[in-house]
Design a protein with these regions (language model features):
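Catalytic beta/alpha-barrel core
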Residues: 5-13
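Structured C-terminal cap/extension of enzyme domains
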Residues: 1-4, 18-137
């Protein structure tokens, strides 16, 4: 069997939680996560939105950490691959690995919040935004 598997996973793209991540964990495979920020579109989606107060309960200070802590809280995840050329963004990303992580109940709240943001974009075409046109960080 393979030594590792590489997949997309984030609060927005969380379909792997049901079968793929548990299967990889059961098989003892390393799991490398790609696109925790949807190629940067995540930042367009959360731009101008305030981080919820309850994010402090799991030591989350930024929207980047919000997504990364969600991913890192899954016990099947071995490594999260982020892409940036900005040293400040890299430091912010690294800080997500420290402190508390969200529990399953909190991860449910995180999914719901992000789903609301996605629904706003996809269900209100008058906003002029789509996932494809969202600005990237």
């Amino acid at each position: 069997s393979p030594d590792f598997v590489h997949m997309n996973y984030s609060p927005m793209e969380n379909g792997a939680e049901e079968r793929l991540l548990p299967l990889a964990q059961d098989m003892g495979m390393a799991v490398l996560i790609n696109r925790p920020f949807m190629n940067g579109r995540y930042f367009g989606m959360v731009a101008g939105k305030e981080l919820p107060e309850w994010a402090a309960d799991f030591d989350c200070q930024t929207w980047a950490q919000f997504s990364l802590k969600y991913v890192l809280a899954n016990p099947a995840v071995t490594c999260v691959l982020t892409e940036t050329t900005n040293p400040d963004h890299m430091e912010e990303n690294i800080r997500a690995a420290f402190g508390r992580l969200p529990d399953e109940s909190t991860k449910g709240r995180m999914r719901e919040l992000v789903r609301e943001f996605l629904d706003y974009i996809t269900l209100r075409p008058s906003s002029g935004k789509t996932l494809e046109t969202l600005p990237r960080r």
